[in-house]
Amino acid sequence: MHNLSLFEPGRGNVSCGGPFLGCPNESNPAPLPLPQPLAVAVPVVYGVICAVGLAGNSAVLYVLLRTPRMKTVTNVFILNLAIADELFTLVLPINIADFLLRRWPFGEVMCKLIVAVDQYNTFSSLYFLAVMSADRYLVVLATAESRRVSGRTYGAARAVSLAVWALVTLVVLPFAVFARLDEEQGRRQCVLVFPQPEAFWWRASRLYTLVLGFAIPVSTICALYITLLCRLRAIQLDSHAKALDRAKKRVTLLVVAILAVCLLCWTPYHLSTIVALTTDLPQTPLVIGISYFITSLSYANSCLNPFLYAFLDDSFRRSLRQLVSCRTA
């Protein structure tokens, strides 16, 4: 369902916003039938992502909420990332049902809710990663200068997280407003129904997502890390700062790894948006297959972060083992 993957390839409504590289014009009479291998592979891949994501993010939430020593500033942001991923994987079965049934059976309220959750997933990851990058900027710079970051507390991190959720809610609200049920080729679909001219509004929605969901947060993150590297080059670390730097290196590595995986999963989708805005690709089986691959890659981001925590965070591994052993004892 990515950036409304509730929409089908090749459908006639020019408000198409799904994961597809091209947008069909209004004269297309019917959607192209999916190749049989793709019709089988897509729900299987979505199902695996859903199962792995639910299990992994549930484990992350369990550890972070039940272990007192895991209540750190960085983990507040990781907790919110896990909540966003968990919400998305919880509604992914509805996407799978929509794909298999080829129609929307869940009503308009659920349509608006699923569209909103989908958009939360699109925007929240990079927004929280921008906040985590800003936090790393302050911590690493303060470490290099042998000082503490004033006001960096667990409570402050929670307040910032609430502010991020409020901002994301404002950003995704237009999608929920435009989402509604519409009859297309005799089937009821959950789609974005834009005012006239639809083509203009469709392009505006894709540009809106590209700028607010990718260009601004990624530019902010890049600016933070470039500025940090330039500042560090000008600072001579003393022995105390070097010791602190080594102690905090794993946390910084974890944040950078989460960011790298997020960009790997989301960049192809946003590049496809540029293609959709600048070209008029036909809805061929190849284009549809590439589009579903891009969608699946963006979905996969919701199940990969727990593996990063398990491999890169010793505290997370220890806490998870202790909680599991306590439950089985």
UniProtKB/Swiss-Prot annotation:
Keyword flag Transmembrane: yes
Topological domain spans for side Cytoplasmic: 64-74, 135-159, 227-250, 301-329
Paired cysteines (S-S): C111-C190
GO BP terms: G protein-coupled receptor signaling pathway; neuropeptide signaling pathway; regulation of metabolic process
Subcellular location: Cell membrane
Signal sequence, renumbered to the chain: none
Record-linked Gene3D superfamilies: Rhodopsin 7-helix transmembrane proteins
One Gene Ontology MF term: neuropeptide binding
Lipid bilayer topology: Multi-pass membrane protein
InterPro entries: GPCR_Rhodpsn (IPR000276), GPCR_Rhodpsn_7TM (IPR017452), Neuropept_B/W_rcpt (IPR009150)
Residues modified by glycosylation: N3, N13, N25
Keyword Heme: no
Extracellular side: 1-39, 100-114, 180-204, 276-285
Keywords linked to the UniProt accession: Cell membrane, Disulfide bond, G-protein coupled receptor, Glycoprotein, Membrane, Receptor, Transducer, Transmembrane, Transmembrane helix
A Gene Ontology term for the protein's cellular component: neuron projection
Domain of life: Eukaryota
Transmembrane segments: 40-63, 75-99, 115-134, 160-179, 205-226, 251-275, 286-300
Family classification: Belongs to the G-protein coupled receptor 1 family.
Stated role: Interacts specifically with a number of opioid ligands. Receptor for neuropeptides B and W, which may be involved in neuroendocrine system regulation, food intake and the organization of other signals.
Protein name per its UniProtKB record: Neuropeptides B/W receptor type 1
Organism from which the protein derives: Rattus norvegicus (Rat)
